[in-house]
């Protein structure tokens, strides 16, 4: 089942949506509470974090899923056609149909954070295919991807998000299998690791392996992004033996940045492709495939708000925490948990202690949260 565990030596880890503290004059109580409320701000791409962080050091978070229980009760959700996914309680895996004739459909789990090119992150999972056919639509006779990876849900759920155009699917970091459709297609199959930036036009280079998956074999797919060298590395084993050892996708000079917030098993729509004949080849493609996925492990960087505490300083409420570089932090206050007011200027994280102070503290009650946003 999904989890955000800490290492045993860490002393504990609490992760939820908002970093909330309360002020009550004149007794100066300090309270912490959790909330499931979310604020959707697509363009700002912001999130807020809740609870009191008690880690003595920064530890990466991990999402795991082995499908021993119903994943829809463990944080997973479906966008699109629910019929493409079926939890198998006997085999304890997820049966998946990748059908490009349907609308974009995702079986996804929110990460609880926002990843960018300056983050280290990874995903590993098992993949077993029962069957697959590329070019199944005679009007779209070429190949099309079967994909698993990271996406930006707010963008990927828009009608104009089209993986097959080559420029209408921004903010992706994913593994894809392109089967060989035969016919006029001369390029064969491929396995790819790819990142697409926020413009949708700039892709990583490399990350390509000219192999095909086969049915009834168990593949362990690993994608590992390292910020220090701007590489997304793909490794794959087949039945516990090395199959693809080092597929490296590198960010080019034109690659801007990306923002991804969900891990997803993605069945993309074939809509929007160029169906014209180009020298005897129609490059527009389609796919129908069936298989199972299992044993997900997603590794994430430390949360952007750590070691949060709150206290009065000269009769003004002050939040103290460790922030991360490339995040912006703002202190917000509410009296009713419906409307929130910014009560501090935005401060940039730098990997050390940050202090946010309410310069206009209320006369009676006030509840606070720290909002962390990726600019």
Label the predicted regions:
Residues 63, 71-101:
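Extracellular glycan-recognition surfaces and repeat-rich motifs
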Residues 67, 125, 212-249:
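Carbohydrate-binding surfaces in secreted/extracellular proteins
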Residues 67, 287, 294-298:
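Extracellular beta-strand elements of beta-rich domains used
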Residues 98-194:
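Secretory/extracellular carbohydrate-interaction modules
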Residues 185-220:
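Short, aromatic/His-centered strand-loop micro-motif at the edge of beta-sheets
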Residues 248-288:
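Flexible glycan-contacting loops in extracellular carbohydrate-active proteins
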Residues 300-375:
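Short, composition-biased motifs enriched in small/polar/acidic residues
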């Amino acid at each position: 089942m999904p989890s955000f565990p800490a290492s045993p030596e860490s002393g504990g880890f609490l992760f939820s949506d908002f970093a909330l503290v309360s002020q009550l004059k004149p007794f100066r109580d300090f309270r912490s509470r959790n909330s499931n409320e979310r604020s959707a701000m697509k363009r700002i791409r912001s999130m807020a974090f809740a609870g009191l962080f008690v880690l003595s050091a920064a530890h990466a978070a991990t999402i795991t899923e082995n499908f021993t229980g119903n994943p829809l009760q463990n944080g997973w959700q479906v966008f699109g056609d629910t019929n493409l996914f079926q939890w198998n309680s006997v085999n304890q895996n997820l049966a998946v149909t990748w059908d490009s004739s349907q609308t974009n459909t995702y079986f996804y789990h929110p990460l609880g954070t926002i990843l960018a090119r300056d983050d280290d992150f990874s995903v590993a999972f098992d993949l077993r295919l029962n069957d697959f056919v590329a070019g199944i639509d005679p009007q779209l006779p070429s190949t099309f991807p079967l994909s698993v990876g990271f996406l930006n849900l707010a963008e990927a759920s828009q009608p104009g998000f089209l993986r097959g155009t080559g420029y209408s699917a921004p903010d992706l970091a994913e593994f894809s299998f392109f089967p060989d459709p035969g016919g006029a297609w001369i390029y064969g199959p491929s396995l790819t690791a790819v990142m697409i930036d926020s413009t949708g036009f700039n892709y990583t280079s490399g990350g390509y392996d000219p192999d095909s998956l086969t049915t009834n074999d168990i593949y362990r797919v690993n994608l590992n992004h390292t910020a220090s060298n701007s590489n997304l590395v793909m490794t794959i084993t087949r039945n516990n033996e090395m199959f693809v050892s080092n597929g490296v996708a590198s960010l080019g000079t034109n690659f801007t940045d990306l923002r991804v917030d969900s891990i997803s098993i993605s069945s993309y729509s074939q809509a929007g492709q160029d169906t014209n004949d180009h020298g005897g080849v129609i490059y527009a493609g389609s796919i129908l495939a069936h298989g199972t996925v299992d044993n997900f492990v997603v590794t994430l960087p430390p949360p952007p708000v750590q070691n949060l505490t709150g206290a009065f300083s000269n009769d003004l409420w002050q939040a103290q925490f460790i922030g991360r570089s490339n995040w912006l932090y703002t202190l917000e206050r509410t009296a009713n948990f419906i409307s929130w007011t910014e009560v501090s200027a935005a401060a940039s994280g730098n990997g050390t202690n940050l202090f946010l102070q309410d310069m206009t503290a209320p006369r009676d009650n006030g509840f606070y949260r720290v909002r962390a946003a990726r600019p």
